[in-house]
UniProtKB/Swiss-Prot annotation:
Its main location: mitochondrion. Belongs to the MDM34 family. It comes from Penicillium rubens (strain ATCC 28089 / DSM 1075 / NRRL 1951 / Wisconsin 54-1255). This is Mitochondrial distribution and morphology protein 34-1. Residues 383-394 have a biased composition (Low complexity). InterPro entries: Mdm34, SMP_LBD. Component of the ERMES/MDM complex, which serves as a molecular tether to connect the endoplasmic reticulum (ER) and mitochondria. Components of this complex are involved in the control of mitochondrial shape and protein biogenesis, and function in nonvesicular lipid trafficking between the ER and mitochondria. Mdm34 is required for the interaction of the ER-resident membrane protein mmm1 and the outer mitochondrial membrane-resident beta-barrel protein mdm10. Residues 297-408, 414-433, 452-473 are annotated as: Disordered. Keywords: Lipid transport, Lipid-binding, Membrane, Mitochondrion, Mitochondrion outer membrane, Transmembrane, Transmembrane beta strand, Transport. GO terms for molecular function: lipid binding.
Length: 564
């Protein structure tokens, strides 16, 4: 089925074209215009042509005498045309500066001068094709909705056809605006026109509105801004106005009316204009200074407060705290080891936090202790555990206190032996356990006490005439190899022995000293050589391996820390 349109009455009716032009003008100025168009768009000529559109029925949903609803396929290739007039900006630099913020664009003197040129555009050769939903009712008029974009092509003729760039630009911009017009604005325009033709009430309302517009005077104040003046009014020069000056002003007076602005708003606008240098409203203004966008007073105060001399630096505070906590942890670890000798413990050291506390002399630092704890159960008396606890606490107290350089040397130090002692595995293996292995561990794990040679050199030069206690090699020999385990000692090893250390083995100054530094170094070397030879003779003795190799015993079991 096809429709036959009676197109001639639409062409002959002049009032219809006038009304359609007004509606198209309002629709074109409603949407946001591109910045190149600086004037209003006016429809000066509209002609629908002599060729009607073609409609193909796809679906009919409702059919009656006063109403109709259906879906159609529309195609139009006719001779309709439309003529528009407006004003455009011919200077592209002016258009660029208008669309950019002032603080991010240059400010030329004459190159940015606006140049407005009138423009006339004629749209013709429309080609439309799309699906239309058409609803007709005598009470509600015609409702037409496009399901897709119907515009295929059109021809744009303008004043700038001789300039290819401007012609192509206008072609693209107008096509984009017309696509929006067909989808959004054209259905509303057609609906209003249909109401004017078929609805008598709407027609009477339109006539009444036109009469009211004609009778309404066009001159006179529409809204008097002087009825409610601002709180702190100023004129265009910034001078504060009194209430009497405001009362004397009126819109009908012949005198020039001053522009009334609020002083607070002017200050805010001035601050906002000056703040374009730093993007902050509270940056102080300093001449001949390059501002940075992120330099604000709040950030400067916060950054300076961290490094102020009132509060100590963060790293030093952590170091002091870490040193205190490390001492407490070590003390608790020592007491825990003395109370629970059947479980392995670890000493946690605050390495990252105690860096500041380790900047002093090495004499203040406590030597790290390595202990091998027996995991096997053995009978322990309360007296033994008490003695171990007392020995550990005294050791920690004496080693944690910082000795002075002028203090006297200590002759006896009650200290828990640092040497790893392997307890007996069983009564049977106690008699067959080789003594050479334990003796070697004892001799290798013990070292000579350190000596402060630099302090002795200064002391020898300062006091060459005072007698010096000769270095006793027996002390060193006893220190290195005097502790020799026996089967009786392995069965009940002493937990807190008292060792006699010579005064020469400590790094403290002596009251009397004789001899030279060369003799002292020679004695130290001689003592070390004697101790090394004694250790080698004990290791290489033939009777030491007889017990181990003669009975064909199995291999030595792993240390108690790893074997179960």
């Amino acid at each position: 089925m096809a429709f036959k349109f009676n197109w001639s009455p639409l062409i002959a009716d002049a009032s219809f074209y006038t009304r359609a032009q007004d509606l198209l003008t309002a629709a074109l100025n409603k949407s946001p215009k591109p910045p190149i168009i600086v004037g209003d768009i006016t429809v000066t000529e509209l002609n629908l042509g002599s060729i009607p559109p073609e409609l193909e029925i796809l679906e009919i949903g409702d059919l009656a005498e006063d109403r109709f609803r259906g879906i159609f396929k529309m195609s139009y290739t006719g001779d309709a045309f439309l003529t528009l007039k407006t004003r455009v900006q011919a200077n592209p630099l002016n258009t660029y500066l208008i669309t950019r913020p002032s603080f991010a664009s240059p400010l030329p003197l004459a190159a940015a001068t606006p140049l407005t040129i009138p423009l006339q555009i004629t749209l013709s050769d429309f080609k439309l094709s799309g699906f239309v939903i058409l609803v007709f009712s005598e009470q509600k008029g015609i409702t037409l909705v496009f399901r897709n974009d119907p515009l295929e092509s059109l021809k744009v003729s303008s004043t700038f056809d001789s300039i290819p760039f401007v012609r192509d630009f206008l072609q693209g911009e107008i096509e984009a605006q017309l696509r929006i017009l067909f989808i959004d604005e054209l259905p509303a325009i057609i609906h209003r026109l249909s109401l004017q033709l078929w609805d008598p009430e709407y027609r009477a309302e339109e006539i009444q509105n036109q009469m009211n517009t004609t009778l309404t005077p066009t001159k006179g104040p529409g809204h008097d801004p002087l009825v409610t003046p601002p709180q702190d009014p100023v004129d265009s020069l910034g001078n504060v106005l009194d209430e009497s000056d405001i009362a004397s002003l009126s819109l009908d007076s012949a005198a020039e009316t001053h522009s009334l602005f609020s002083q607070k708003n002017l200050l805010s606008l001035a601050t906002l204009t000056d703040s374009q240098r730093t993007l902050s409203l509270f940056t102080p203004s300093i001449q001949q200074v390059v501002y940075r966008a992120w330099s604000s007073p709040d950030q400067n105060d916060s950054s300076a407060s961290v490094m102020s001399p009132i509060s100590p630096p963060l790293s030093r505070t952590q170091s002091q705290t870490g040193g205190i906590f490390a001492s407490i942890d070590n003390a608790s670890t020592s007491s825990a080891q003395s109370r629970t000798p059947t479980g392995p413990t670890q000493s946690f050291s605050s390495y990252g936090l105690s860096l500041g506390a380790s900047r002093h002399s090495r004499a203040h630092a406590r030597r790290r202790k390595k202990r091998v704890v027996d995991l096997r159960s053995r009978p322990t008396t309360p007296s033994d555990s008490a003695s171990v606890s007392v020995s550990d606490e005294s050791t920690y107290t004496e080693s944690a206190s910082a000795p002075s350089v002028t203090s006297a040397p200590l002759q006896a130090i009650h200290e828990q032996p640092d040497d790893p002692v392997t307890p007996p595995l069983s009564p049977e293996s106690d008699q067959s356990l080789p003594a050479i292995v334990e003796e070697r561990r004892l001799s290798l794990s013990r070292s000579l006490p350190r000596r402060d040679l630099s302090s002795e050199i200064v002391r020898d030069r300062a006091e060459p005439s005072e007698p010096r206690n000769p270095f006793n090699t027996d002390d060193v020999i006893v220190t290195v190899g005097s502790v020799r385990p026996t089967p009786h000692q392995e069965a009940s090893p002493p937990l807190g022995p008292t060792r006699q250390l010579s005064a020469a083995g400590l790094p403290f100054p002596h009251d009397s000293s004789t001899g030279s530094v060369v003799d002292q170094v020679f004695l130290d070397t001689l003592a070390g050589e004697v101790a090394r030879r004694m250790r080698d003779e004990k290791l290489m003795a033939p009777n030491s391996c007889g017990t181990f190799c003669g009975h064909g015993l199995p291999e030595e079991p792993p240390p108690p820390a790893y074997g179960q």
